[in-house]
Amino acid sequence: VASENRYEGTVGVSGNLPFLGTADVAGEFPTAGIGEILYGCGNGAVGITREGGLGYGAGYGGGYGLGYGGYGGGYGLGYGGYGGCGCGCGY
């Protein structure tokens, strides 16, 4: 989340973001005022959960010549008719 807006006065923001968090202040603070950032993340216990997904199935490039850029020389079944080695180098 990035903002290039100018905020004056007291600004309160709350909610959840999908990352730990950062704060950046650029520019100069006026000499007649103050500026600060108060940042907290609950009790300090950060949990990242995994939602959804298919697990260890036959996924993108996971098959032996059957997926997109699969492993080995899987002629006819891979993307573009050639399975490739799966590393993206074109071989």
From Swiss-Prot:
Entry-linked InterPro entries: Chorion
One record GO biological process: chorion-containing eggshell formation
GO cellular component: a single term: egg chorion
Region (Right arm (Gly-rich tandem repeats)): 52-91
Region described as Central domain: 1-51
Pfam families: Chorion_1
Protein name: Chorion class B protein M3A5
Source species: Bombyx mori
Classification of source organism: Eukaryota, Metazoa, Ecdysozoa, Arthropoda, Hexapoda
